[in-house]
């Protein structure tokens, strides 16, 4: 996980 993986998956690993 890197960014906003809750509402917006911007960087979900």
Swiss-Prot record:
Q: Which GO terms describe its cellular component?
A: plasma membrane
**Key words of the record:** Cell membrane, Lipoprotein, Membrane, Pheromone, Prenylation
Query: What is its membrane topology?
Result: Lipid-anchor
Q: Which domain of life is it from?
A: Eukaryota
- Which molecular function term from Gene Ontology is one that the record holds? pheromone activity
Cell location: Cell membrane
Q: Where is this site: Not methylated?
A: 13
Lipid-modified sites (S-farnesyl cysteine): 13
Name of the protein this chain belongs to: Tremerogen A-13
């Amino acid at each position: 996980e890197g960014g906003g993986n809750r509402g917006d998956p911007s960087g979900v690993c």
